[in-house]
Structure formats: C-alpha cells, structure tokens
Amino acid sequence: MQPYDVKLDYLGKPWCTVPLEVGHNEIGDADAADWAELTDAGELFEAMGFPAPGRAPLMPLDHQVAQKLHAVSGPGDRARDLIDLQLIDARAEVDLAAARAACRRLFSYRRAQAWPPAIAKQKGWDEMYASLAEGLPVLQDVDEAIRWTNEFVARIEDAR
C-alpha cells in the first residue's frame, strides 16, 4: 500500500485532508469485488442535496482479513487491525477456508513473515488500542484482543 494525503478544497478554499491508501493487485485481491449498497451514506447525501452514491465495490473479506493479519503480525503500529478484525468477524460471515487460502498466498507473496503468524504486542499498543477501542463493541484490553486474534488465526488455519 502506498499512503497519500488528499487535500480537498470546497468553494475554492482548503477544506480538509483525507488519507488514501492505494495498492496494487498483489494476489488477485482486485480481480473481483464484493458490492455493497451504501444505504446510510445515500440517506446522508440526499439530506445534503446530493444524489445517492449507489453501490460501492469493496475488497472481498477474505483478502481484507489476509491483509490485516499480515499488517498486524509485522512490526509497527497496526493495533487498529486488532479492532478491525473483531468487527469484521462479528458483523460478517468470513469464509475461513477462503481466508486461509488468501493468507497463505499473501504471506508467501510478500515474504516478510511466515503463515500462520503469532501476533505479539508492539511498543505503544496499550495506549493506541485503548483509545481506538473505546466505545466500540470489541474487547477493551489489548492483551485480550491479541489472544483473540491469535485464536482467529488458528480458526483460519484449521479451515479447509
């Protein structure tokens, strides 16, 4: 992924900056999309006088899970992926066998760490995780979240 800051103007004046990550099709993750109706966003757009955006293409969940597990198992500040993975698992039906195949391909392709990984707490994760998890329907303790994520990895690895 290549991160960019996109600066938006409104009525000719600087308005805000939004982060954008652009990636390339590493293992077929962009070959097919899961389409989602943007009902809530459509209502907001229409309330502001804009046309509803309709459907949006999303990366398939098995590939999202693979990318998040790869990110959270490497060095760095990806404590947010612990939260994302819990939310994905709670709100969607993840095909664990497809996720296993995507994880094996992605980890092999990137050659940074082995599949299946062991998730370990990184420096700064206690504070980062606590601030991000507050008010969300996820485990509130980072150590519990890491334990849960390692169990999630085991469930994926056991799927056939």
Please provide the spans of the model-predicted regions.
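Structured mid-to-C-terminal alpha-helical surface segments
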Residues: 1-160
